[in-house]
Amino acid sequence: MWFCDECGQAVGHGNVLAGEPPTCIEHGPRWRLIRNAPCASVVIVNNGKVLLARRAKPPFEGSWEVPGGFVERGEHPVEAAVREVREELGVGVNLTGLVGVYLETSSLGEALQIMVFEGTTEATEPTPDPAEVSEWSWFAPDEFPTDMAGRHRLRLDDWHRGRAVGLPADGRS
């Protein structure tokens, strides 16, 4: 997948051989692209349960995941994690720790850098974006679904083992 060099959003492939560059919906035709962008996600905990979302679109459509997404150009990963949760599930989140940084390869062979945070929310009834999330549910650690996207189960297992470490007060240092 290719991403706009201005905003980091995924762009269509275009037809470069015919002189038609990939196009960003917001910034138009792009000849200069970035190959990948870092990702940030949040293991959201409330009363011992974790909020998971079922993907409404590819890749992994219909699979459960830890909510998150791409870090936009110039955005701090902490800010991206909070923004992605609000966009996908319509809830605010307070980040409380870092579960880990994962270096993975996507199904397309692209390098991924995924920062997984731990967070809490007081919201118990998310209002998800139906374009992103088809279903949501709170799961106890012994009830995590088996049909999870990519390596999301590994991230949840790391969180459950207590690997999250605290963040500085401003979440940046």
Where are the regions that the model predicts?
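NUDIX/MutT-family hydrolases
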Residues: 128-160
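Short, well-ordered beta-strand micro-motif
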Residues: 44, 116-120, 137-140
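Active-site-adjacent beta-strand/loop module that shapes the phosphate/pyrophosphate-binding cleft
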Residues: 102-125
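Charged phosphate-binding loop/patch that engages nucleotide di/tri-phosphates or the phosphate backbone
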Residues: 158-173
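A short coil-to-beta-strand element that immediately follows conserved catalytic motifs
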Residues: 14-15, 92-100
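Acidic, metal-coordinating catalytic segment for phosphate/diphosphate chemistry
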Residues: 1-41
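Conserved Nudix-box catalytic region and its N-terminal flanking loop in Nudix hydrolases
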Residues: 45-87
